[in-house]
C-alpha cells in the first residue's frame, strides 16, 4: 500500500531560502521514489479552522518508505531550511 507525506504551508517567510530547500530536497525525494501528486498554492477552506495557503501531497511506495525518507540523513540535513523559511507542518499517512 502506498504511503503519503502531506505538508501544509501557512506562510513562506523567506522565499529565497524556501526555494533553496526545494532544490536541496529534490535529490532526496528522487532517491526514495517520491511522486508529487499535488503542489498547490490555490487553497480554499470549506469548513473548520484549517487554513493553509499551500498543500503538498507526495506518494511513496509504502508508509514505511515515506517514514524512511523523512527520517533519512539526506532529508534531515535539509529539513531545517523548510522549517526556518516557512510556517509549515507535515504528516505521514497510510494509503490503506
Q: Predicted segments — roles?
A:
Residues 54-56, 88-89:
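Generic beta-strand structural signal
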Residues 63-91:
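C-terminal structural segments of small proteins and small subunits
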Residues 1-54, 61-67, 71, 94-96:
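Short S/T/G/P-rich N-terminal loop/turn motif that feeds into the first structured element of a domain
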